[in-house]
Swiss-Prot record:
Name of the gene this protein is made from: fimV
Matches recorded under PANTHER family: NUCLEOPROTEIN TPR, NUCLEOPROTEIN TPR-RELATED
InterPro entries reported for this sequence: FimV_C_sf, LysM_dom, LysM_dom_sf, Motility_prot_FimV_C, Motility_prot_FimV_N, TPR-like_helical_dom_sf
Organism listed in the record: Pseudomonas aeruginosa (strain UCBPP-PA14)
Protein name listed in UniProt: Motility hub protein FimV
A GO BP annotation: mRNA export from nucleus
Ranges for domain LysM: 174-229
Length: 924
């Protein structure tokens, strides 16, 4: 599914790439229509508007995040800007940028965001605001008018001041002559390229024309100056940010010095306009200023007044006029010098261009000469053709300084004269170019160098083909990735299968049972098994309802731990599902977890209905079969340990006594001794549970059933202290002369381990198999012990009381008529023990303790734990080891099988030893 989505996305991307011919909305340049200290009025050109309406184009100021990404400060006064789209169907469409308040900042730098149906546009704009109609020359020429206007002396000087301003003409294609209303911002904006910002172009103009600015400030451009236009490379010498910071510094410097200068200029302009506005104005000013000194009345009153006073006034008037003329001459000289510098710089630039052209021609000659002599002849005409052009340009420029040299003499008319010669020389070389036949020669040479466009050039020039090729390459790449992913998935699957195949071999090493491997299987105090609490870890839950499907995916990739966790969680939710448990058994088999395998097998056995599938799993994973043998041996050892710690305190028996002879010393215990472990597992051993038939001619153990072979031996050993097992019987005191048999409840028969130990001899308590049961004694199913309360206050078992069928009594008592029946019953006990040995995996629950309320507390005797109940001795343990050795042989573990067979040779009987030797011969 993921691959399909990736393919769909790739096709969508390819379709987007193929639509390269679609046109989109664009933003052009900004045109400023306002000045400093005025409300902003500007227009941004809209490109490729086509059928869009004004409602579909939504311009606005960019968000603060976009400003921060672009590295531009979003100042507060920018929020006053309003953007209004003006979409014209057949005309020029623009975005009007206006503000409601006057803009007092010398420049504005902001980001414009335009939203339209097909996308979004974002562009940065920088606007430099100049003062309205500011010109330094106008303020400088104003004082000349009032000095010369009132009389004939100033008449010829009035038209001379604006002469250099109005006689403007372009000096060439690489230069520009300023006029009174020009600003450096507009000049730089017209002559820059798209790669160059306006501040970069302004600083390049200032660097090439330092004399065209007052005090070296870009805001004080002189009018009538010939500016050299910088190239794009010169404009790009500074970064946009560096150029913007320098422009800001010059703007701040200009603003700091603008107020006093403007005040002085304004005062001078105001004074001049008052004097030229009306004829009556000079009469009011004459009382205090120079009008009286330059008036004609000074000559008339020269003879009438006293001589010293009239002469001083005339001299002062002449001195003032002379100073004014000197000041005017000085300014004209400075202006002429600046023009001379501009011409000289222009001449230097032309010479550099000529050198560059010569170098290019020389390079072309070298290239053509290497190709052949035929191509060298047309190339030879190129320098000849270019030399007249260079010669025509060179004399034209020296001619201008020659004509300008005599200009300082006519102080007033000199500025107009040098302005004409630079204009006249350019047409002269144009007229001389047609006679030169070699000039058009470079065109064929250049055309010959450009070969016909190749297929690659046509391909690169066609965006549609580029989009198709790009989409095809992308699709091919996606197909390749899909093939690689499938190959990797197949490889992982093969690795998982190989891992599953080798799992059996890897698990054989984990099964290491040494010679003493069963010595640790001891349980001193067996407790009921309680399921362990699930660990508090993050559960791997099924993403879908099919937990088996997800588990199969994990198994295919070899992630057995995650599969096991997933199945365990699913079993926790649905414990009755056998298919989940079977899958979990398979995962445990792959992981080599024998305990988990056996645990799930037991769970399935309890649930039922899945035994054929379990057998199939066992056949598929023979390594797990050894678990059964190990479990059987472990169960046998566990049962032995439980019987080692067996005490009569754990039994609850009902004893019922019948009529006994008052003078009897004791009763035969084997008359009614019935100990069945099958009944012990059920709870109380009452009258219904323990069944015994006491007959007059035989006393036997009817249903003596144990978990292993039981050896019963008569104990005749000497008295010795009890070490491990306290085997005590608490008997109730009987009446001195009971007339009727008393029915005692064996449920109250208890074993007191804390009772004081009395060391009694064998004579105190004699377990006799020879005493005859009285003929009058009726048969009873109860466990009956008849004691003489008068003679024995407390009875105890002998120290060497051992129920072992393996060892026969060495010195049995003289057999009487009950001895034959006892031997027959021993055979029945052996058969029952064999039957119980096959069901060791189903242990019975522990029997509850019991006590006798009517019996007195008797002292308990301790018995040796090692000799009390030896149920797992002899042939059964050796047979189990033989079964385990066969399982090892089936798994291929020869060393483990050989070790176990050696133990059987040392511990087993003759038949088992013979079978062990046969297996060893097969291994050899």
């Amino acid at each position: 599914m993921v691959r399909l989505r990736t393919l769909v996305r790739a096709i969508a991307a390819a379709s987007v790439l193929t639509s390269g011919m679609a046109h989109g909305l664009g933003l052009g340049e900004i045109t400023l229509k306002s000045a400093l200290n005025q409300p902003l009025d500007a227009e941004i050109e809209l490109l490729e508007v086509r059928d869009l309406g004004s409602g579909e184009v939504i311009p606005s100021l960019a968000s603060p995040e976009e400003f921060s990404k672009a590295g531009v400060d979003r100042l507060y006064y920018l929020t006053d800007l309003k953007f209004t789209p003006v979409v014209k169907p057949n005309g020029k469409s623009v975005i009007r940028v206006t503000s409601s308040k006057p803009v007092q900042e010398p420049y504005l730098n902001f980001l414009v965001q335009v939203l339209w149906p097909n996308g979004r546009l974002l562009r940065e704009y920088t606007v430099l605001l100049d003062p309205p109609l500011y010109s330094p020359q106008a303020a400088a020429s104003a004082p000349q008018a009032p000095v010369s206007a009132p009389r004939a002396t100033g008449a010829p000087r009035t038209p001379q001041a604006p002469a250099p301003v109005r006689t403007t003409a372009p000096a060439g294609s690489d230069t520009y002559r300023t006029v009174s209303n020009d600003t450096l911002w507009e000049i730089a904006q017209r002559n820059r390229t798209d790669r160059v910002s306006v501040p970069q172009a302004m600083l390049a103009f200032q660097e090439l024309n330092p004399g065209a600015f007052v005090d070296g400030n870009i805001n004080r451009l002189k009018s009538g100056q010939v500016l050299r236009i910088p190239t794009e490379q010169q404009m790009l010498e500074r970064s946009p940010r560096e150029a913007l910071s320098q422009v800001q510094a010059q703007n701040q410097s200009w603003r700091g010095s603008r107020n006093p200068a403007a005040g002085t200029a304004g005062a001078r302009q105001l004074d001049a306009t008052q004097r030229n506005a009306a004829g009556s104005a000079p009469s009011k000013v004459d009382a205090t200023d120079n009008l009286r000194l330059v008036s004609g009345e000074g000559k008339a009153s020269k003879g009438a007044d006293k001589g010293g006073k009239g002469d001083s006034k005339a001299i002062a008037d002449t001195l003032a006029v002379t100073k004014e003329s000197l000041d005017s001459t000085r300014r004209e000289n400075e202006e002429l010098q600046s023009r001379m510098q501009d011409l000289q710089s222009q001449l230097d630039k032309l010479q550099k261009l000529i050198q560059l052209k010569d170098a290019q021609l020389a390079k072309l000659q070298g290239q053509l000469g290497a190709e052949g002599q035929g191509a060298a002849q047309p190339n030879a005409a190129l320098p000849d053709a270019s030399q007249p052009n260079a010669a025509a340009q060179a004399p034209a420029q020296p001619g201008t300084p020659a004509a300008a040299a005599p200009t300082p003499a006519p102080a007033g008319e000199a500025p107009a004269a040098p302005a004409q010669p630079p204009v006249a020389p350019p047409p002269a070389p144009v007229a001389e170019k047609p006679p030169a036949p070699a000039v058009p020669a470079p065109a064929p040479v250049q055309a010959a160098e450009q070969p016909a466009p190749s297929f690659l050039d046509e391909l690169l020039a066609n965006p549609l083909w580029l989009a198709v090729i790009g989409g095809s390459a992308l699709l091919a790449l996606l197909v390749l990735l899909m093939i690689l992913s499938r190959r990797n998935a197949q490889k992982e699957k093969e690795e998982a299968q190989a891992f599953a195949a080798d799992a059996g071999e890897e698990q054989e090493d984990a099964l290491d049972l040494g010679k003493d491997g069963f010595d640790d299987l001891t349980l001193d105090e067996p407790e009921p098994q309680v399921a362990a609490a699930a660990p508090q870890v993050e559960k791997t839950t099924a993403q879908t309802s099919d937990a088996l499907g997800e588990a199969d995916i994990y198994i295919a990739y070899g992630r057995f731990n995650q599969a096991a966790e997933l199945l365990q969680n699913a079993i926790y939710d649905e414990p009755q599902r056998t298919d989940l448990r079977l899958k979990l058994m398979e995962v445990y088999a792959e992981m080599g977890d024998r305990e988990g395998f056996a645990r799930q097998e037991n769970e399935l056995r309890e649930i039922g209905g899945a035994q054929p599938q379990v057998e199939q799993l066992k056949s598929r994973y023979p390594a797990m079969v050894a678990v059964a043998a190990v479990a059987g041996l472990a169960g046998a050892k566990l049962a032995q340990d439980e019987l080692d710690s067996f005490s009569l305190d754990d039994l609850s028996l009902d004893d019922s006594g019948h009529a006994a002879k008052p003078d009897a010393a004791g009763q035969d215990l084997d008359d009614a001794f019935d100990l069945s472990l099958d009944d012990l597992g059920g709870g109380d051993l009452g009258s219904d549970d323990v069944q015994a038939d006491l007959k007059s001619d035989s006393g036997a153990l009817d249903d003596l059933t144990l978990d292993s072979d039981l050896d019963l031996a008569a104990s005749t050993a000497a008295d010795k202290p009890v070490d491990d097992l306290d085997f005590g019987l608490d008997f109730a005191e009987l009446a001195e002369t009971p007339s009727q048999p008393k029915h005692d409840d064996l449920g109250d028969f208890s074993l007191d381990l804390d009772a004081p130990e009395d060391k009694l001899s064998d004579d105190d308590f004699l377990l006799s198999l020879n005493d005859e049961v009285p003929a009058a004694a009726p048969a009873n199913n109860e466990f009956t012990l008849d004691t003489e309360a008068a003679e024995e206050p407390a009875l105890s078992l002998p120290d060497d009381f051992d129920l072992s069928l393996a060892d026969e009594p060495t010195e049995p008592a003289a057999p009487e008529k009950g001895e034959d029946s006892f031997a027959a019953q021993l055979d029945e006990v052996s058969a029952q023990l064999d039957e119980l040995a096959s069901n060791l995996d189903e242990p019975k629950s522990a029997a509850p303790s019991f006590s006798a309320e009517d019996a007195a507390v008797a002292s308990a005797l301790d018995g040796d734990a090692d000799d009390d109940f030896d149920f797992l001795s002899g042939a059964d343990e050796a047979a189990t080891k033989l079964d385990l050795a066969r399982a090892y042989i089936d798994m291929g573990d020869s060393e483990g099988a050989r070790d176990i067979l050696d133990e059987v040779l040392a511990e087993g009987n003759d038949s088992q030893q013979a079978e062990a030797r046969e297996l060893l011969e097969r291994l050899a």
